[in-house]
Each structure stands twice: as structure tokens, then as C-alpha cells.
Amino acid sequence: MNEMRRNAKKRPAVKKVFALLLALSMFCTLLAGCGRKEETDNVTVRVGAMSGPTAMGMVKLMKDSEDGAAKGTYEFADLSTDPSTFVAPLTKGDIDIAAVPSNLASVIYNNTNGGVQILAVNTLGVLNIVERGDSVQSIKDLAGKKLYATGQGATPEYTLRHILKENGIDPDSGLTIQWCADTTEALSYIANDSEAIAMLPQPFATAAMGQVDGLRVAIDLNDAWTEIEDCDIVTGVVVARTDFVKEHPQAVETFLSEYEASIAYTNDNAADAAELIAGYGIVAKAPLAEKAIPKCHITFLKGQEMKDSVSGYLQILFDENPQAVGGTIPADDFYYGL
């Protein structure tokens, strides 16, 4: 009987020890889990962006990163005017995320067997037809005229050709297109010829209007596009290496959250954002940047909305020239989060 009493007294003590061990085990597991999350969150995300609308939407995140106010840890590459600058770093793994033209994203995807994914759309159409007179009121008014343009062999050319054809103008014989090496060359023609007509991207079109008296936007090609198509012109997207997405999902989600907020800041606080844009050398002067922001169609589309816009636009580019998108239309795994 005494032995039974002694055993009964031991049982509560054993239960207490077991409960303590269980609590310690759960606590250690929780600590380990937190450690993994912290490690993922603290990975340095290497980001590249083109100097233009894509970078204009990223300036608040860039500034927050500099000030140590960003949630993620970022390393921003030097801004570039040449989108091909980021091709090799992306394929080699030297950059994790980059803002690039939508068709270039497709080309990289095809050339790397799915090595990148689109995270979001960041820029819609940025092309404008500009002139110093008032001879152009619609696309049809370009028939028989000479047009100076930039972007040969890239999305500006394919977008222009499609719009012209849908408006009954043969892009090869219905007008004369003189392709310029860059916007500076196109601007020189406008400055020296009062009757010159040009296709310029934003924010350079706005900058040109500050340099050439009487220069005006005759046509926003976004408007001309939506008159003939259901999808948008998708100029720019942000992509990530597929391996990086798999290895650091939390870092990708954090970047997207902060990037979306940065884009909203640019659109909602144009004056303050313009100061940052000028400070990073994207546009020479803040007043010009402030005027250009509403015309740059800086946006943030993700998920199904992103896929619908990008896939529709890529299909039209493919129909114009299959090589413009890398030869084939990307599969569904091209689109992050779907």
C-alpha cells in the first residue's frame, strides 16, 4: 500500500517534467522557424532597373533602402538606358530582380528554359507622337508623312507597325519612317525642322517639350492602341530569376509589397517623387519629372490581371515578329503567383 502511495506521488512530478520538456521542444522549434524566416528576409536582393519610367516608380524604394527604412535588404545596380545590360547578369545569377521591357522578359525566358518569371507589370504604353504644328490629329494623318522614331527592332517599332496597319497604313510604304539611334538624334530633327513629326517615349517627350518651343503631344499611342485592342500596351515588367523565387519566396513577397508602395508613392506624390527622380538622374530637372509622371503610365499589375495584359500584348508582338518574343509564347509558369 505504501509503495502504491509513493508511485502515485511520483506521477505528478513525471507529468510536470514531461510537460516542461514538451514546452522546451516547441519553443526550440519556434526559434528555428523564426531563424529561417529571418535568414530569408535578410537576403540581399540585387535589383536592376532601366533609367526611365520603370526606375521612376522605384525611387521611393531606392531611397528607403539607402536610409535603412526598407523592410528588405536591397542592392541596386547602376541605372541603364540599354535593357540588354541586365540580360547577362540575370542569366548568370549576378542580379536577382530586374525591370525590363516585356518582350525582353519573354526572350530571356525562352533562352533560359524558363529561367525567369514575371512578378508584375510596372509600365504601360509610353509612346507619343509629337509635332510643332497641328497637322496630326489622328493616326490616319500620318499617311504620306515622314516620321522620326526611336526603338527600331524593339517594342516601339512593333507597336507602331501594328497601330499603323490597323488604321489602314502600310508601315513600309504608306509613310516614311526614319529610325534614329536615340532620342537625342530625333530631338535634333524636331528642333531644326518646324514641320518634323516624331515618335518619342516618355519621359523624353516631356523633356523635349521643355526644349523646343511649340512642341506638343499630338497622339498618345495608348489611346490609339485601345481603339483597336482589348489588351494594354505593356512596356515594362519586373522579373526575377526563377531559382531566386524558389529559394527566397519571402524576400520576393517583401520586394513586391515595397515596390507596389513605391509606385503608389510616385503616382500619388508627384512633386516629392520628382525630386527623387531628378536626384537619381533619371530626368534632368524635378519640374520636368513632375509633368512627365502622369504621362508615363506607371502602374502595378500582378496575378491574373498581369497575365492577361502581358499575354495579350506578347501575342500581338509574336504575330508581328516571332523573334520579338524569343520565338514562342511563354508557358503559364512565366507568370509568378499563378
PLM features per residue range, with description:
Residues 245-320:
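Secondary-structure end/capping motifs
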Residues 311-338:
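Conserved C-terminal helix/tail region of periplasmic/extracytoplasmic solute-binding proteins
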Residues 66-73, 223-231, 298-307:
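Short, solvent-exposed loop/beta-turn-alpha elements that line the ligand-binding surface or hinge
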Residues 103-104, 184-277:
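Pocket-lining segment of extracytoplasmic ligand-binding domains
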Residues 40-169, 177-179, 196, 202, ...:
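Short, glycine-/small- and polar/acidic-enriched structural segments
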Residues 60-61, 127-136, 232-251, 302:
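A bilobed periplasmic-binding-protein/Venus flytrap-type ligand-binding module shared by bacterial periplasmic
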Residues 45-46, 95, 145-150, 189-195, ...:
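Second-shell loop/turn segments in exported
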Residues 1-44:
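Short, low-complexity disordered leader/linker segments with a strong preference
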